[in-house]
Amino acid sequence: MGWQNPPVPWREIERRLSDRPAEADGGDSPAWSRKREPYVAPPSIAAAPPARQHHSSVPYAELHCHSSFSFLDGASHPEELAEEAARLGLEALAITDHDGFYGVVRFAEAARAVGIATVFGAELTVDKLDISPGQADPDGSHLLVLARNPKGYATLARVISEAQLAGEKGAPRFTMSDLDRWASPDELNDWLVLTGCRKGLVPRTLEREGPAAAARALGSLTERFGRDNVAVELWDHGSPLDTVRNDAMVDLAIRAGVEPVATNNVHYANPNARRLASAMAAVRSRRSLDEIEGWLPAMTSAHLRSGDEQARRFARYPGVVERAAELGLACAFDLSLVA
C-alpha cells in the first residue's frame, strides 16, 4: 500500500524551504498557458516602481479602457496598457472589456509589476437585438460598470455569467429588467456606473432625442443605482462635436446632482496602435479598409493620456480630471482579494 505521490522536484523543495509563494499551475484561469511565461516588466519601468518616466503634475486615472480581450475592438494587450499607464504616470487604470473579465488576470499581474493601481469593470451590452456578424456599427446600448470593491466584482461577475448563459456565444442577453433579478439593490451599491461612450444610454439619448430625454435617461440611472453611484462621463477625441456633447453632459450632471468625470474611452495604448485598431474594425465588420473608412474616427485619439494632456483637453471643465484620479483610487483593489 502506498500513497502514490508524484516525485517532488528539487526546485519545489527549495521553494518550500525558502518560503516563496507557489507558482500558479493555471487552475481554471483563462489567462494561463504553459507557453506564456510569467510577466516581467520592462527594465525601464521595473527599475524604480512606482516612480514614473513621465511625471504628470495633474493626477489622473483612466476609468474606461478596452484591451485586446474586447475582441476586434481593443488593439492593445493588457500588459501594454499597464506599461503605458506607468510611463504616463497614471494613478490607476481600469480595464472595462465588453461583457467579461477575460483579461483581468494578465492585467493584474502586469499592473502589480509596474506599480499601477488596478480597477476592474466591464462594459455591458444592453438590449442588443441584432446579433448578426459583420455590422460596421453593431446595435445595443452600453452600460459601463466599475467594481468599487471585491463584493462589487463578485456581483458583476455573477451578472455577466447570467447574461452569457441567457444569450448565445458572442451575444450575451442583458436588459435592465434582468438586472433587477440578478442583483439586489444593496449589491448595486458596490458598483460605480459611468454614462459611457456614444452608445451609453445618456449620450445616445442626447444625440437622438435631445436634452430633455437625456435628463430622463440620466434620472433612470440615478434612480436605479443611486446618485452617489453614477458619474457622467466626458471624453474628447478631437471631434468638433465633442465639446458640444460635453457641454450638454456637464449641464445634465449639474441639474441631476451627479459628478462629471473625464475619461478618454481608450481602445489602444498609444498612437502607434491606431492602424492596428482600424484593421481590426475592418475585420470585425467584414469590410475592406477602404469600405470601413467612413465609419472610422477621423483622429488618432483613443489612446492613454497623461493627466497633463487630459487637463489641457478638459480645461473648460475644472476638476473632472482630478476627480477621475479620486474615483480610480477609491475603486482600486488587488485582484488577489477576490480569490
List the predicted regions and their residue ranges:
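Phosphodiester-processing cores and adjacent nucleic acid-binding clamps
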Residues: M1-A339
